[in-house]
A protein has these predicted regions:
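A ligand-binding cleft/hinge motif common to bilobed small-molecule-binding domains
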Residues: 1-3, 51-54, 75-108
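Acidic, polar ligand-binding/catalytic clefts
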Residues: 1-32, 98-107
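Short loop->beta-strand "edge-of-pocket" segments that line small-molecule binding or catalytic clefts
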Residues: 30-46
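Ligand-binding clefts/hinges and TM-proximal coupling segments of bilobed small-molecule sensing domains
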Residues: 37, 46-62, 101-102, 131-149
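Hydrophobic residues within well-ordered alpha-helices
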Residues: 33, 73-75, 114, 127
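Short helix-initiation/N-cap motifs at beta->coil->alpha
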Residues: 25-28, 62-76, 108-110
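Beta->alpha turn/N-cap motifs
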Residues: 20, 45-46, 66-67, 83-90
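A bilobed periplasmic-binding-protein/Venus flytrap-type ligand-binding module shared by bacterial periplasmic
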Residues: 16-25, 110-130
């Protein structure tokens, strides 16, 4: 059995916290979320469920069954906060003008890489070289800025 290969990493996905415009003044970082009376929402069975349980043991956690999602609970006013990746968060910020990012340092950086055939070292080397050149020229930084990452 062969395992997959990966390219060098080119950027990272991080976790951020979000709320609505009317509640943003209540939150100034991660610690302000981890309090009794704060309702956090997340989708049952996801990585975000585990992270929410670990990071916010003092908050009131609502687990939402898919296909519903934590952001929908917050937008509906039934919860105060949800967490998601910077990638999805950027999309939600542009889609819903009422959503606000809570000012807090991003958490849990996860490097992104391209899935590659492990046995094709020539191809892996080519892609790694391409990633290195693109990084040096600021390509991935420009993409991140363009898409609000």
């Amino acid at each position: 059995m062969k395992a997959a290969g990966y390219s060098d990493t080119y950027m990272s996905v991080v976790i951020k916290a979000f709320t609505t415009e009317d509640k943003i003044s209540r939150f100034d970082g991660w610690d302000s979320i981890n309090k009794a009376g704060v309702k956090t929402a997340t989708t049952l069975g996801t990585t975000f469920e585990t992270l929410s349980k670990n990071w916010f043991p003092n908050s009131d956690l609502t687990l939402i069954e898919a296909p519903a999602r934590g952001d929908q609970e917050v937008l509906a006013g039934r919860s105060d906060v949800f967490i998601t990746s910077n990638v999805e968060g950027s999309t939600l910020l542009s889609k819903y003008p009422n959503i606000r990012e809570i000012p807090a340092a991003p958490r849990n950086p996860t490097p992104l890489a391209m899935l590659m055939p492990q046995a094709d070292q020539v191809w892996i080397n080519f892609v790694d070289h391409w990633v290195k050149i693109k990084k040096a020229r600021g390509f991935f930084d420009e993409l991140a800025k363009k898409h609000g990452l």
